[in-house]
Amino acid sequence: MSRKKEQQLRKYGTLVVLFIFQVQIFGFDVDNRPTTDVCSTHTILPGPKGDDGEKGDRGEVGKQGKVGPKGPKGNKGTVGDVGDQGMLGKIGPIGGKGDKGAKGISGVSGKKGKAGTVCDCGRYRRVVGQLNINVARLNTSIKFVKNVIAGIRETDEKFYYIVKEEKNYREALMHCRDRGGTLAMPKDEVTNALLADYISSSGLFRAFIGLNDMEKEGQFVYADSSPLQNYSNWKDGEPHDSTGHEDCVEMLSTGEWNDSECQVTIYFICEFLKKRK
């Protein structure tokens, strides 16, 4: 056998031995399947843990999982954009009356009118003047009647009415006469008590009555010029004319009489006769 062939045989023998040795160490057969130990008298231990391999490719998407539990309430989001205008709703009820508006701007002046005819207005002015006087009297009478309706007192023969307008004695006397009456004249105790209660219940303290001594000091006469005779109800110490000008008489809410200055302005009581049927 040549030397060259010996070397080849030795080489192949060495390779076979190494192969068998590897099989014993790793315990795998040619098909990479586990095999039984070559020698039952030897225990083959696992080798050390190898290094981590390279990261594999991304796998396919898995199946959808089950619905999880409801999460906590999130924060309030930002206000969205204004939506489209909705459909027109039903007409609502009529609202209350509004406040009066501000005064508007003055309009444009109108065209100048045509000249009027010449008028003899003198007689018309007189008629208009008299009408104004009559209207003023009528308004005064209407006002008086309205006040009378509000409350009066009466006896079998007369009506009595407190006029709540402050006037002096002469003005009060004329006011009553212009309306067909006169200032009240309490000539007996019953009438005096009626007028006193009238003054008191009206919330007043005093009022003029139709009694005075303007003609002669100390001699009192009624508004109809009849003298003071059988009945009087002077307050203690009255009349005393303390100022020298107390020539008219007022009745107090107590029913007592007091002489007073005629120029003071106070409420007064008118007296009217009842019409006989």
From Swiss-Prot:
Tissue note: Widely expressed. Highly expressed in lung. Weakly expressed in larynx, syrinx and cranial air sac. Expressed throughout the lower gastrointestinal tract in increasing levels starting from a faint signal in duodenum and ending with relatively high signals in proctodeum, coprodeum and urodeum. In the upper part of the gastrointestinal tract, expressed in tongue, crop, and mucosa of the crop.
InterPro entries from the UniProt entry: C-type_lectin-like, C-type_lectin-like/link_sf, C-type_lectin_CS, CLec_Tetranectin-domain, Collagen, Collectin_CTLD, CTDL_fold
Disulfide bonds: C176-C270, C248-C262
Entry annotated with the keyword Coiled coil: no
Subcellular location(s) of the protein: Secreted; Golgi apparatus; Cytoplasm
Any single Pfam family the record assigns to this protein: Collagen
Residue ranges of every copy of the C-type lectin domain listed in the record: 155-271
Low complexity bias spans: 64-79
SMART domains to which the protein is assigned, alphabetical: CLECT
Limits of the Collagen-like domain: 56-115
Location of region: Disordered: 41-82
Alphabetical list of CDD domains matching this protein: CLECT_collectin_like
Cellular component GO terms, alphabetical: collagen trimer; extracellular space; Golgi apparatus
Residues carrying a glycan: N258
Keyword line: Calcium, Collagen, Cytoplasm, Disulfide bond, Glycoprotein, Golgi apparatus, Lectin, Mannose-binding, Secreted, Signal
PANTHER family for the chain: C-TYPE LECTIN DOMAIN FAMILY 11 MEMBER A, TETRANECTIN-RELATED
Record family assignment: Belongs to the COLEC10/COLEC11 family.
Protein name: Collectin-10
